[in-house]
Amino acid sequence: MISREEHAQGLTLVTVSDIGSNHRALLLPNQDSVDFIIDGEDFVLAVSDGVGSCPKAELGSKEAVASCIRVFTLIKNRIIEFESDNVVDALINEWRVSLDHENLDDCCATLKAIFKIGQVMKVVSVGDGFIAVSSDGLNLLSPTEEMAFSNETSCLCSRIEPRDFWTSDFNLDTHKPYAAFCCTDGVANGLVTQFSHKDRNN
């Protein structure tokens, strides 16, 4: 298991990733990727799961997460506007460019990302897994797919289009506590029902 925790500006960001039992038994690499960066009171948190049937899925997920970090930097540097369409277009472009010498369909991956800029938390999702945000009695939950472990999810691939992404904005009162959670399908399958029917207080 790989874990990372960082504290800054009143934020606590934690990431945990572990290789699945099937991949461990077959001596295959961990296809999950996760990363975050904090810049002042703003941050990006991203998690990606390589689609198991693709031979370079771990590379696809790694570059999906890295693309989120690069897009966050573009936003902070005011190179692109913090609008959903711009963020999604930039993510797709960054992912494709980073894999320019690869067959994109060998590198398929899902993606869940949270971009927090100022008082707006923008969530971006393609494929299975889910994102949940909660603050002051308000909750946001991304759509979920009922195709657990089937390798039949929407994903970053050669045919990916902006309309394949789900996006939403969550407006924060930054003086009040909030929690944000994003995970891949392995965790989502066990938690999504609970998040759908219960408020989580932190």
Features from the language model and the residues they span:
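PP2C/PPM-type serine/threonine phosphatase catalytic domain
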Residues: M1-N202
